[in-house]
Amino acid sequence: IRDRFGASDAYMLIEGLHTTTTASLKPGGDIVSPAGPLSIGWPVYFYDENDNVCRGFVSAGHAYSTGDSATLNGMTIGVCVDSAFSGRNDAALIKITNSNYSMSDVVNVSNHTLSNDKYMLVSEGSTIYKVGSTSGYRSGTVTSTNGSVTYRINNQPLTISNVLAV
């Protein structure tokens, strides 16, 4: 169902005598973690401990611990089922637990459709794009690969390697 402007960000499901609105969660859109606001990442499907297929998205591992809630507009929409933040990883797997929300295949602010079926290695000179709740939609040219960056977390150095310079 599209609204009068052609948008289809939400649809109505008729269940008996009541109506449920399902809102789209768009990659690059806002989400709130215990550490503060950040972006919704790629949509994913995964198996839980009972081999049930679950829906969710990837977000920033430095902002979540396992069991933390992900919220949007003050409402819990999911829970972190796994989180990694180390020299090679910065990812959290968020399981969508609120049936009023589902993932969209359209990137927030850019209306580009996602391609979930592949990934590619980029080389120097490639143009890459990113979208985030605080950074907006940006692009850049890869100037080098296999770089590293060091952060200080709790006064301890953390070096992340194999990063791109843009």
Predicted region positions:
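Surface-exposed, low-hydrophobicity beta-strand/loop segments enriched in small/polar/acidic residues
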Residues: 162-166
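Serine endopeptidase catalytic core focused on the charge-relay Asp
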Residues: 24-161
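Autoinhibitory propeptides
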Residues: 1-23
